[in-house]
């Protein structure tokens, strides 16, 4: 026996069950379109670390930085962590991260890549 709810598709039902509202999803989409993202490379004790910086921590929380970090690490097959409002990924993945962020809904013109390498 199949139950059908009028006016709702499977995604709506799943969102309701998991607690994600349309407003939260809409706010996250708007934030992604407006967010300014800086991608830079640091050299730490001979190893490269790619930093994806989202500016302030409130914007990062609205963007769902934890889920984003998990997805980036999985897609890049690299380790990483979250610090305040930025994601650290092991290795030089600047161009790949830019492509992935565009796929996730960020605007290309709002993603800035620093070409230099910072020594720390």
UniProtKB/Swiss-Prot annotation:
Keywords on record: Protein biosynthesis, Translation regulation
Biological process per Gene Ontology, one example term: regulation of translation
One Pfam family matching this protein: SUI1
GO MF assignments: translation initiation factor activity
Domain of life where this protein originates: Archaea
The keyword Plastid appears for this protein: no
Keyword check for Protein biosynthesis: yes
Family classification: Belongs to the SUI1 family.
UniProt protein name: Protein translation factor SUI1 homolog
């Amino acid at each position: 026996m199949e139950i059908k709810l009028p006016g709702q598709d499977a995604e709506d039902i799943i969102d309701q069950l998991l607690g994600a509202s349309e407003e939260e999803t809409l706010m996250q989409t708007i934030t992604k379109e407006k967010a300014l993202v800086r991608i830079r490379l640091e050299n730490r004790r001979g190893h490269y670390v790619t930093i994806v910086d989202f500016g302030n921590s409130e914007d990062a929380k609205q963007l769902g930085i934890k889920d984003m970090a998990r997805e980036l690490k999985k897609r890049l097959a690299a380790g990483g962590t979250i610090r305040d409002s930025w994601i650290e990924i092991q290795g030089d993945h600047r161009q790949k991260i830019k492509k992935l962020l565009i796929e996730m809904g960020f605007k290309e013109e709002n993603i800035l890549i620093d070409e230099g390498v910072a020594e720390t």
